[in-house]
């Protein structure tokens, strides 16, 4: 049985980080942070969703979405716990229980996600 692609994170940043580390032990997990009112976030989300369409059902990539306005404490607390500067839009890619890479804004392209996934 395959796992659902999307995961829901706890509101507490430390609990969310633990959940991400656990979920990424056997799959890539991408946290996509976005603002619902930012055109740059809209463009980056489009690129991310285009990349998601290229995945097949067997590809072990899971996704967690964070709305940086509605979930501000989680968005900022998670990056603080990772010692990464908060950005929006921003992708945080976890593999093997660790943060493998992160990037933001114009760097969030379908090609970059494909590269990160090793496809």
Spell out what each predicted region is.
Residues 19-55:
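Local sequence-structure signature of Cys/Sec-based thiol-disulfide redox active-site neighborhoods
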Residues 33, 58-75:
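Thiol-based oxidoreductase modules, predominantly thioredoxin-like and allied folds used
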Residues 42-45, 75-76, 106, 110:
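Conserved strand-to-helix beginnings and helix N-cap segments that scaffold or border functional pockets
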Residues 53-57, 112-114:
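Short cysteine/histidine-rich metal-coordination sites, predominantly Zn2+-binding motifs
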Residues 85-87, 92-119:
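Non-catalytic, surface beta->alpha helical segment in thiol-disulfide oxidoreductase systems
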């Amino acid at each position: 049985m395959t796992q659902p692609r999307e995961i829901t994170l706890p509101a507490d940043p430390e609990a969310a980080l633990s959940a991400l580390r656990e979920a990424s032990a056997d799959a890539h997990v991408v946290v996509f942070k976005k603002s619902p009112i930012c055109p740059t976030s809209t463009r980056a989300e489009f690129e991310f969703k285009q990349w998601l369409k290229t995945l097949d059902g067997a590809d072990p990539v899971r996704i967690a979405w964070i709305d940086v306005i509605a979930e501000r404490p989680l968005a900022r607390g998670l990056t603080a716990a990772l010692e990464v500067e908060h950005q929006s839009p921003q992708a945080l890619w976890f593999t093997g229980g660790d943060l493998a890479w992160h990037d933001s804004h114009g760097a969030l392209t379908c090609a970059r996600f494909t590269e990160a996934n090793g496809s």
